[in-house]
Amino acid sequence: MELYDALRTTFAAREFTADPLPDDVLAKILDQARFAPSGGNRQGWRVIVVREPATKRSLGDLSAFAGRRYAAQAANGESPWNTIDPPRVDAATIERTPVPPHLTEAIATAPVVLVVCVDLKVVASIDQDLKRVGIISGASIYPFAWNILLAARHEGFGGTITTLATAREPEIKKLLGIPPHFAVCAVMPLGRAARTLFRLKRKPVAEFSKRERWDGPAFGR
């Protein structure tokens, strides 16, 4: 697949056919994804390939806690789980909010689920002393996760990067035997997408790009 086509058509697939994703194809996908950049080329990623139905169901169930709050905040017009604005919904509202099936069922029903982790001993968390949530470590793991989706798209498969289960990271670590110094970064269901989107909606360049300064004129169209 031509690169620009892949960039414009790799969507978040959450519904899959019954077609398997064979080990040899998955190995090819990971073989391409490993060429992602990482700080110092330390390549701190680790991947757990999950096919066992019970384990996939457990990972889906672990996504429900964060998914419930996500849905409650979204229904209240909030940006869910952001660290700037405190949630305006109370605990009781969150507790009685049903979890939208699309947030958890893909993990339980996908042919394969990848649990992507990163070694915290090798990533540079340069923003660790700032008075905000740390995000810089993600530069050494999420390009790898995105490469997985691009390579899967090239091979005729799809998936998505989900993070809801990470709110229950201790339980995931216990379930999968993950060492303490690793962080769980994503739970990625993969398979043959039940449908394909060819027209993704994104903001135009001029809405997010400025010249020279934050308050500079728009760049692009």
Residue positions per predicted region:
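Short acidic N-proximal helix/loop "leader" segments that mark the beginning
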Residues: 1-24, 28
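C-terminal helix-cap and adjacent tail motif
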Residues: 6, 12-13, 84-85, 183-221
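Short catalytic-loop micro-motif centered on adjacent basic/acidic residues
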Residues: 15-16, 46, 158-162
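Small-aliphatic-rich amphipathic alpha-helix that forms the alpha element of a beta-alpha
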Residues: 29, 33, 114-174
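Glycine-rich phosphate/pyrophosphate-binding beta-alpha loops
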Residues: 35-41
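Short, basic and Ser/Thr-rich N-terminal targeting/leader segments
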Residues: 41-44, 108-110, 183
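Glycine/small-residue-rich phosphate/adenosyl-binding loop
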Residues: 49-140
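Short, conserved aromatic-histidine micro-motifs
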Residues: 65-68, 174-190
